[in-house]
Every structure is written in C-alpha cells, then in structure tokens.
Amino acid sequence: MYHLIPFAAILGMTYALSLAIYRLFLSPLAKFPGPKLAAVTGWVETYYQLFYGEGGQFIFLYKEWHQKYGPIIRINPWEVHISDSCFFEILYSTNRPLKKLPHLAKVFDNELSGFSTVSPELHRIRRKAVSHLFSKGEVLKRGAQIQSAMDRLSERLKLDFLGHGNRVICMNDMWSVYTADLIAEYAFGRHYGFIDQPNFEADFTKALVHLLEPTHLAQQFPWLTDILKALPTSVLEFLHPHMAAFNKFKAANQVRIAKANFAKDLSKGGTMFSAIFNSDLPDEEKSIERAHQEALAFAAAGAETVAATLSVASFHLLHDPKIRRRLDEELATVVPDSRSSDASMPSLEILWQLPYLTGIINEALRLSYGSYARIPRTSDTPIQYDEWTIPPGVVFSMDIAPAHHDERIFPDSYSFKPERWLDNPQAFDGKPLTRYLFSFSRGTRSCLGMQLALAEMYIGIVSFFSRFDAHLFETDLTDITFVRDRFAPRPRIGSRGVRVNRLTTRKF
C-alpha cells in the first residue's frame, strides 16, 4: 500500500503542472494581462477574501492590478475583470442576456428567487410577474403608507429619546427597522412592528447584517452550502445564532404565504406573493416555496441597502453644518409648519422635485454603492471590449465602486458634495452625470425596488431632519468608510455605526 504514495505524489504533481501550463498558455483566457499566479490558481482570491486583513480584500488587490496591467485583466483562472466606467452600462445593458454563475446563485440559499435565477429567460419571466408592484406610479400610491411608517418612527423617537440627552441612537439600527417594516409589508402584506423594538434592535435586521459575514466562505467553497443545508435546523442555529431569528421570520411567512394562496381576497393583490399567485406564470412557478423565496429575497436585499444609504446621508447632514443649513432652507419652502415636530410632510411628488435633497440622496447612493462585490456574469455570445474579445462562456465582471470614484466623472470623489448634482450636470463625455450612478446596477437585473427605495429615502430624510436635531456621538468618517466586501459594503471591524445623542425637536 505504502509503495503507492510516491506514485500518487508524482501523479498529483504532474496534474498540477499540466493544469498550470494549460491555464498559462492554452486557456482561452491566456491572452489577457494580469499576474501569473492569479491565472494559475484561485487560491489568491480565497486568501484575500477569507484570511488577509479583515477579509473581503480582493476588491482592493485587483484594483492595484488594474493600475499595473490596464483596464481589462484576468483575476483568476476563469474570470476576466474590466475597470472602465464608460463600459459598465454597455456590458450590463438591457439588450444583452447575461447568465448568473450557478454556484453563486446558491450562496444565499434562495435559488428559486428572481435574484438568484441563472437563466436570463427565466429571470425575465419571474421579474415580469411582480414588476408592476414597483413602478413609480404604484410607489406614489403608497406614499401615505411610507409616511405612516416614518410617523411611527418619529413617535418612538419622541417617547423614548426626546429629553433624554445621554441616550444614544444608532442610526443604522433606526433606519434598518424603518426600511424592514416597509419592505416586509410590501412583500408579505403584514406589519411586523420592527420599529417598536427596544432601541430599534430587531432580531431580523440584526440577522441580515450578521448572515452576510460568511458570504465569501460560501462563495469560495460552494459545497459547504450543500452540507449546511443538510444539517438539522437546531445545529445550524447553534453554529450561527442569528440564523434562529431569520428562520423564525421565514417560518412565520411560509404559513402566511400558504394561507394567501387560498385566500378569497387574493385578487386584490398588493403583495409580492399575491402578485405571483395571480400572474400568468406556469404552475410550477407558483409554488409556496418559490413565492416565499421571492418575497424574502426582496425583503432581505432592500432593508439593509436602503438603511446604509440613509445612514451615510445622516452622517454628513450632522457632520457638516453647511449641508444641513442648505437642506433646511430648501425644506422651509415646502414643509407647511417647519417649526413643529408634528409638521405634516409634503407629498412624494413634491419631494422628488427638490434639487438639493435629490443631490444629498444621489451622493449618499454614490458613497454607499449598493453592492460592494463585483458582478460576475457569462454570455452565450462574445463580448467585445476595445481590441479584446471575451469568448462565450467565459466569466467576466465589473464593480460599482470604481465607477463612483472615477475622478474624471466625480472630482474629489471621496468627498460628500450634493451640489455636484445640481443644474443637470454632465460628465466629461457629455452624458448626464446620473448615467454614472450605478447603485441600483443596470440592465435586466437592475434593482427591482429602485423607486420604492428612493421613496423611502426622500420621506425618511425629510421627516427626520424637519422634526429633529441630534449630535454625532463617538462617530467619525471611519464609520461610513467601507473597507470590507461582504457583498454589501462594510466599515472597519469594531465600528458601531452612525450614533447620535442629545435628540431635540427642530428649531429654525
């Protein structure tokens, strides 16, 4: 038996050497520039995603490679990455059917949702069934519902924090329960009362943050996902305590969806699962599990991203008096009784017309990015970038963050400057500046809930900053500077978020 060990070792070395030679010289990707070690092995990415620094650092490594090798590089044995702000909208255009990677679709354990659908054709069918719920017109109809959530939040602030100068509010938590309540109601048709949780610390919203931490482990070792799914729920919850809160939320909604499937008033619609059950989708697309995954994916994806954007905006409004003062001047023209914490709020139609408020939201979107991870896809047809042709079936990707820090488009790009969005500005190439705001991505897989997210941001900022004053507490720029990729952007480990105290009613 032992005499086979040298033979096995030689066989293994021969295979490894042959694989390296193929990847360096014979692979369809061999012609693309980039570091040779990354072309040979995917362990470079694994090391930087899991072990280097605080993890999630590969995005910064291949940024350095781009500076050395150019705008198109090979970042691992099977993937080409492009860094060119002008090409983002072209690559992810609505006219180009692109496929998600099957192993990445399994990372969040929701393969039946539109978010994780691999096939562009199936994705189109699934998206069409619910897209009418997220049109601008439909969101406008729900303006009062969004305002009601913000009014409930304002009441909580007045009851529990107003007059208690030393009580600290984590704005990240506050905005998370606001967005989660709204999105869950939109998805499931139920008010969950996240806003009513003590200190705005809801188990569900906390779970969303913590469950993204092992994202790269699942991406680098997809087989782990299958193993974990096979484990009993009790074991999973022991290994990851936040899974218990998430599973409790899932179980409650599965029962609710099952009831909705047979409800007499299902035709009234208004939720994602009623839209699915009432659609012309084939029967296999109307299963309770698929409807549940669709709604849950939307709720999970929308809650944290909107809250992060609102937290970035809140920091800068509290950090820079000039920005706050200019917003106050604009709001004074539309808020009827701006001296009262009970001031009635303008309609969404009016808020959408405010240029400086729009500039604040656009800057917050630009500096919160939406997704911090690269967006890998494949195509059945060749992709042409300058003189480079990416063959069919080869993985290619781009990121949002580099475009948002392209100094040709956004000078002084790390500074928060709402005024850069005023007076219909143009980029260096003559295109509207908004064409380079990619927080909601682009193409057929762009964010389904964009209009709802924007409505939440407009109403949230106006309601809070018309009604309240606060002071930053033990918070600085490092708490909104994102230095880790966890699919969503993350600040340094140890950051406690954007925190404030000394809450008072607004005085003009």
From Swiss-Prot:
What are the recorded GO MF terms, alphabetically?
Answer: heme binding; iron ion binding; monooxygenase activity; oxidoreductase activity, acting on paired donors, with incorporation or reduction of molecular oxygen
Q: Organism, per UniProt?
A: Eupenicillium brefeldianum
Q: Which InterPro entries match?
A: Cyt_P450, Cyt_P450_CS, Cyt_P450_E_grp-I, Cyt_P450_sf, Cytochrome_P450_monoxygenase
Q: Which cofactor does it need?
A: heme
Keywords, in A-Z order = Heme, Iron, Metal-binding, Monooxygenase, Oxidoreductase
Role of this protein? Cytochrome P450 monooxygenase; part of the gene cluster that mediates the biosynthesis of brefeldin A (BFA), a protein transport inhibitor that shows antiviral, antifungal, and antitumor properties. The proposed biosynthesis of BFA involves formation of an acyclic polyketide chain that is differentially tailored throughout the backbone.
Q: Does the keyword Secreted apply?
A: no
Q: Quote the PANTHER family the UniProt record gives.
A: CYTOCHROME P450, N-ACETYLTRYPTOPHAN 6-HYDROXYLASE IVOC-RELATED
Which top EC class is named for this enzyme in its record?
A: oxidoreductase
Pathway where this protein functions: Mycotoxin biosynthesis
Instruction: Name the family the entry cites.
Output: Belongs to the cytochrome P450 family.
Gene3D superfamilies from the entry?
A: Cytochrome P450
- What GO terms in the biological process aspect are recorded for it? mycotoxin biosynthetic process
* EC number annotated for this UniProt entry: 1.-.-.-
Q: Which gene encodes it?
A: orf4
Q: What turns on expression?
A: Coexpressed with the other cluster genes on brefeldin A production optimized medium.
The entry's heme-binding residues are C447
Q: Does the keyword Ribosomal protein apply?
A: no
Protein name per its UniProtKB record: Cytochrome P450 monooxygenase orf4
Q: Name one Pfam family in it.
A: p450
